[in-house]
Amino acid sequence: MASFETAVQKAIYEKLIANADIISNAIPVYDAVPQPVSVENTDFPYIVIGEDSHAALDTDTENMNMVSITIHTWSRYRGRAETKEIQGYIYNSLQRAALSQPGYKFVTIMQTASESFLDSDGLTRHGVQTFTLIIEEI
C-alpha cells in the first residue's frame, strides 16, 4: 500500500486534473515543473502541488494523519485576475472534496490559507493556497 504522503499527492493530483475549468483552460498541473532552456520559454499559467507536512493522529485502533499541503499557482498575466481565477478552480476542486485512494479514507479537506503576490522577478504572479486534510488508513 502507498504511504500517506503518496496517497495524498495522488488524490489531489487526480482531483485537479479532472476539474473542467482547469481542463478547458489547458492549465497543466505539476509535481515538478519541466525546466525550459530559458525563463522566456516557460509556458504560463500552471499549477504546482508543493510542500506538505504530516502529523500522526494515531489512536489505539486507527492510523490517521493530519496533512497540510500547499498548492502554487504561477501566472504571467499582467494583473491579479488570472491567478485568483485559477485559485478559485483549485478551491472548487478541493474544498470538502470526496477524495479517494486505495487503502485510505479521506475524512475531510479544507482550505486554511490563501494569498497571491508579485514574485521577486517583477513579472510573475504567485498564488499560494494551503489545504489541511485528515486521512485514515483502512
Residue ranges and their predicted role:
Residues 74-93:
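Mid-chain, well-packed structural core segment of small domains
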Residues 1-61, 97-102:
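Small/polar-rich, solvent-exposed N-terminal microdomains that initiate assembly or binding
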Residues 22-24, 37, 92-138:
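Acidic-leaning, charged glycine-interspersed low-complexity segments
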Residues 63-77, 125-135:
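Oligomerization/assembly interface segments of phage tail-like spikes and tubes
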